[in-house]
């Protein structure tokens, strides 16, 4: 009987141990969120869209997922390396340019989800849009038609445009190619001015004051977005119509913007994160190109420039700033 009793105790202990193991909480994944722009307690529209996308898929911050936010204007490389040392399960590069480049240099193993890459193939981030082939996937902000569409909109508002100044950074090479092709088709002459920092921008302004183009555009990336207020103010002061590749430029005082819905891009990034956290490999997840676009027109700026926006264009606008 003693032997039977010991056997029963042993079996019960095994059962309790097994039950305890099954009751152990599952490992909560950690997501690194890398961004240039300063973070505030109130999420930006883009971050809010990303978090909403996660919630729709069952990922609740602080409960089913931990998010490590890292934001810096100058030491983004160090912060990307810090996320790698923390062994996060995935990194979301919020925005194009610096966050994505820093994350890619920091790791070739941890999955990286991009949100606004303008030319992921040309930048060497992925092998192709259909088969990325590495640890990076996500959304691209560009389609070949965008460059021509923006210039067509500009011509619709200002038919006399013949000379267009283009401020661009190396991160916007794909968009620059598309803009060049569109300008050639429309018979526009381009004045290309590379901007890598505030000093370059000041020099560009000095040149534009002397050369006086008919209109101005600044190609979109994380760096140029930070200068949107300066560019919009300069353009208004010198009566230059503008068209941009992000609604933030129009909201800052630019004449108009035509761009992918950025918040939608961040919501889609949450879908990529969900798939990867559930076992999918970035190498096998095709890169998405935008399908939803927004036309934003700033009527206050139009009035300041003495321009009349055609009613047909106003009716097509997704958002009009009055």
Question: What are the language-model segments listed below?
Answer:
Residues 1-322:
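Short hydrophobic alpha-helices and adjacent helix-cap/hinge residues
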């Amino acid at each position: 009987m003693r032997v039977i009793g010991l056997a029963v105790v042993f079996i019960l202990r095994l059962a309790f141990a097994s039950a305890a193991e099954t009751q152990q909480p599952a490992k909560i994944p950690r997501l690194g969120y890398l961004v240039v722009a300063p973070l505030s307690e109130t999420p930006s529209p883009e971050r809010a869209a990303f978090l909403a996308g996660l919630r729709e898929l069952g990922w609740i911050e602080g409960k089913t997922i931990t998010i490590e936010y890292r934001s810096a204007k100058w030491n983004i490389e160090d912060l990307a390396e810090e996320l790698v040392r923390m062994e996060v399960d995935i990194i979301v590069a919020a925005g194009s340019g610096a966050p994505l480049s820093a994350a890619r240099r920091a790791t070739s193993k941890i999955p990286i989800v991009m949100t606004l890459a303008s030319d992921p193939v040309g930048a060497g981030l992925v092998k192709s849009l259909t088969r990325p082939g590495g640890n990076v996937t996500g959304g691209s902000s560009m389609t070949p038609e965008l460059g021509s569409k923006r210039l067509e909109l500009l011509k619709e508002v200002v038919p006399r445009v013949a000379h267009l100044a283009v401020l661009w950074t190396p991160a916007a090479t794909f968009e620059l190619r598309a803009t060049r092709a569109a300008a050639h088709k429309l018979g526009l002459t381009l004045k290309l001015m590379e901007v890598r920092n505030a000093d370059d921008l000041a020099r560009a302004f000095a040149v534009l004051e002397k050369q006086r183009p008919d209109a101005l555009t600044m190609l979109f990336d994380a760096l140029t977005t930070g200068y949107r207020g300066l560019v919009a103010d300069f353009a208004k002061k010198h009566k230059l119509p503008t068209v941009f590749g992000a609604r933030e430029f129009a909201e800052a005082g630019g004449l108009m913007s035509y761009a992918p819905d950025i918040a939608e891009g961040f919501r889609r990034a949450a879908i990529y994160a969900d798939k990867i956290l559930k076992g999918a490999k970035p190498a096998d997840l095709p890169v998405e190109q935008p399908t939803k676009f927004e036309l934003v027109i700033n009527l206050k700026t139009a009035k300041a420039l003495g321009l009349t926006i055609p009613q047909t264009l106003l009716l097509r606008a997704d958002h009009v700033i009055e």
